[in-house]
């Protein structure tokens, strides 16, 4: 189970926010403070991790709409990448799995673009970065962990 999520440049959240998830998590706030945006983020993440789509994100997942255009997801609508982080903690094995991604938007094509993603495992004794991909161009990513370029279509 994912125990924490963090996000930056998402909807009305310019600064990095971290939410610790428990079996029951309650969001309280004034109108237009971002409660619905946070809830929609959960379906956005679920859709992305589920691998059901060709895009990094889909604006509609399980009949929940996150916006009309992909730039609706970005704080200020353009010029920034959404940064998302997910942490899964295993208290028995005393380790954390950490996934971080950054997604920008091609406004002309109305498509999300995966800029970077990394995955690491952290335990009491060390931190092992398993993947750290950075986008070089439209079809090429570089993994900083093994110094290898990967071509994608």
What role is predicted for each listed range?
Residues 1-153:
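P-loop NTPase switch/coupling surface
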